[in-house]
């Protein structure tokens, strides 16, 4: 695993997500308050990107805008159908106003 800079803290608004490509992997980088979450940017239901979806800061989830599958940002576990398989998650850290993601090398 290797730490890769994903974005500046200011690039990710609270209760939102952006898409980034890190080491050849599409990653959904989401923010809830001062916490950042990274998960593979594809819904396990139909392989559509998750990053355009709605982030719920109270539940710490993201909802796929295509079919409504909801995933826990912390674990990648689906919270409702139609998705039944989790999506991979990656560890994040903030350093010097940048967000880093621990990615496979």
What are these regions (language model features)?
Residues 1-61, 72-73, 77, 86-105:
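N-terminal pre-ligand scaffold of iron-sulfur
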Residues 67-70:
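Detector for the c-type heme attachment site
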